[in-house]
Amino acid sequence: METLDKIKKQISENPILIYMKGSPKLPSCGFSARASEALMHCKVPFGYVDILQHPDIRAELPTYANWPTFPQLWVEGELIGGCDIILEMYQAGELQTLLAEVAAKHA
């Protein structure tokens, strides 16, 4: 399977998905740590892809997403953004609402 097809499949199969460095429990950078922590505080299931374990995805995703950095949060096939946007939405209460609605829809 080509990298672009892998990315599209991951995004379509996971209603809430974060591409990050490391894992939510063992993040490998501060931005990924803060972003995944905000997601975990929302208490909804989400998927993740450790881009350090998938250099092909790490290389291809920024072009596909038109977003140059990681982490990247995808919700129902749409790119939400990176760490700053995730944290801003969390602090405003918007992330919790969005993720709760999506999780309920896909439960």
From Swiss-Prot:
Which keywords, in A-to-Z order, does the entry hold?
A: 2Fe-2S, Cytoplasm, Iron, Iron-sulfur, Metal-binding, Redox-active center
Pfam families cross-referenced by the UniProt entry: Glutaredoxin
Q: Name one GO cellular component term.
A: cytoplasm
Q: Known Gene3D superfamilies for this protein?
A: Glutaredoxin (3.40.30.10)
Q: Does the keyword Metal-binding apply?
A: yes
List each copy of the Glutaredoxin domain by range.
Answer: 4-106
What are the GO MF terms of this UniProt record? 2 iron, 2 sulfur cluster binding; disulfide oxidoreductase activity; metal ion binding
The residues listed in the UniProt record as binding [2Fe-2S] cluster, with positions renumbered to this chain, are 29
Give yes or no: UniProt keyword Magnesium: no
Q: Where in the cell is it found?
A: Cytoplasm
Which residues does the record give as glutathione binding sites?
A: 21, 58, 70, 83-84
Family that this chain belongs to: Belongs to the glutaredoxin family. Monothiol subfamily.
- Give the protein's function: Monothiol glutaredoxin involved in the biogenesis of iron-sulfur clusters.
NCBIfam families, alphabetized: Grx4 family monothiol glutaredoxin
Q: How is the quaternary structure described?
A: Homodimer.
* Record's protein name: Glutaredoxin 4
Taxonomic source organism = Haemophilus influenzae (strain 86-028NP)
Q: Which gene encodes it?
A: grxD
